[in-house]
Amino acid sequence: MGSTLFKTIALIGKHKNPDIMTPLLNLAEYLTDRGTSVVLDDLTAAHIGKNQYPVVALEEIGRQADLAIVLGGDGTMLNIARTLVPFSVPLIGINQGRLGFLTDLTVDTMYATLNDMLAGQFIVENRMLLTTEVTRHGESVFKELAFNDVVLHRGISSGMIELEVHINGEYVYSLRSDGLIIATPTGSTAYALSSGGPILHPGLNLMILVPVCPHTLSNRPIVIGADAVIEIKIHYTTETKIYTDSHSWFDLGEHDRVLVRRCPETIKLLHPVHHSYYRMLREKLGWSSILQKNSR
């Protein structure tokens, strides 16, 4: 039995994924043997079936747990992070998805790594979020948090959307395109990356605006400070929607205004001491794989 800095640890699994049951229960037993209290969120508990661990609503985890360990992919981490951000509960991610930009650990090696992390050997990284609000005729009609990005997209309509972008009250440009992405450094490796945006190190206090298939090729991605306030005015739309982390969405109408700004709270991620952001990029994006294969 080892020592741990965390007295109560919440375990949260990717819902409706049959592969998480065994590793999650094994992890719960491992933590219990270390003298840690383990709680499960209600959706995870419902998926894995009857067990001896206390079950609480996801919102209650923030009030009860000192740490949350998430088994799943980046989507699971995004959802949990948005819920727990008001409580400053640190997160550790164990990858059960595909790429896993946010989930450092693997199921095969998690125990050796957790031994060190639970004893205090970890790196703390604070990641920014965005708040977005839609106003219509002066009234707020939609408000949500985003860890990755806020996306305005034309949806299934064949026509482009037309909008104006203002930053800190100053007109910047007009845009005719399939959409616009406003991303955090965390979200720079998601939809923004596939749309031609730059990769931002997560330690930077920046945001990026990335047009999606702009009609004018001079509409390029731009990088702005994290303290900027972005206002988007919708001029023409048919079926345009706004998405936050591909999770929540809302139908936009002409003359709606979208405000995007930095959230005052941050997400606290815990990494192993040997964590390297650049090594993670090499592994996830396959950088230099051909050179390594053909090197002499």
Swiss-Prot record:
Its cofactor is a divalent metal cation. One of its GO terms (molecular function) is NAD+ kinase activity. NAD(+) binds at D74, G75, N148, D149, R176, D178, T189, A190, Y191, A192, L193, S194. Its EC number is 2.7.1.23. It is an enzyme of class 2 (transferase). It is found in: Cytoplasm. The active site is at D74 (proton acceptor). The keyword Transcription does not apply. GO terms for cellular component: cytoplasm. Gene3D superfamilies: Probable inorganic polyphosphate/atp-NAD kinase, domain 1, Probable inorganic polyphosphate/atp-NAD kinase, domain 2. This is NAD kinase.
